[in-house]
Curated annotation (Swiss-Prot):
Protein name: Small ribosomal subunit protein bS6
Species whose genome carries this gene: Mycoplasmopsis synoviae (strain 53) (Mycoplasma synoviae)
Gene: rpsF
Presence of keyword rRNA-binding: yes
Keywords (A to Z) from UniProt: Ribonucleoprotein, Ribosomal protein, RNA-binding, rRNA-binding
Family listed: Belongs to the bacterial ribosomal protein bS6 family.
Keyword S-adenosyl-L-methionine: no
MF-aspect GO terms: rRNA binding; structural constituent of ribosome
Residues annotated as transmembrane: none
Organism domain of life: Bacteria
One CC-aspect GO term: ribonucleoprotein complex
Length: 156
């Protein structure tokens, strides 16, 4: 992905990519012109270009070096789809999520019937504990400080 200024043309970006990758890139897609979260080069708008390519590591290193030199390319991001976890992952669609409640109701009787739960009886310890509620109060003591008047030189 390449981030360029709002006035930079698509042909400029494609010619730069052709000079580095020598027609190895599959496609260079211009994404929409967007407003940035913060200013880059005193502007709040930029263009994104998404580039898919297959090339060697030395060409990627050369691209990074030249994009740092070129003033028209503001930012760049290189992602290796083969080694990056989760980017080429094929998701399983046959997996069931959730429950089928119709099957569960048929096991408990007629459809739509539910059993009432019996109230749980409290043990003796639980019932005694709930009866005994002690109030907690924090004792506060006040200290009185008596200060002595300072002696002056005249009194000595």
């Amino acid at each position: 992905m390449v981030l360029v200024g709002p006035k930079t043309s698509a042909s400029t970006v494609e010619s730069f990519l052709k000079s580095v990758f020598h027609d190895d890139f599959k496609k260079a897609e211009k994404l929409e012109r967007t407003e940035l979260a913060y200013e880059i080069n005193k502007t709040k708008h930029a263009q994104y270009f998404l580039v898919n390519l297959e090339t060697e590591r030395k060409n990627i290193a050369e691209f990074i070096r030249l994009s740092n030199i070129n003033k028209e390319i503001w930012r760049h991001l290189v992602v290796n789809l083969d080694t990056e976890k989760g980017l080429n992952k094929v998701f399983k669609t046959h997996r069931k999520f959730g429950h089928d409640f119709r099957d569960q109701r048929s096991h408990h009787g007629q459809a739509g019937e539910f059993r009432k739960r019996e109230p749980q009886q409290k043990s003796k310890e639980q019932s005694e504990f709930s009866k005994e509620k002690k109030s907690f109060s924090k004792s506060v003591t006040k200290k009185t400080v008596v200060s002595k008047p300072k002696e002056t030189k005249e009194e000595k």
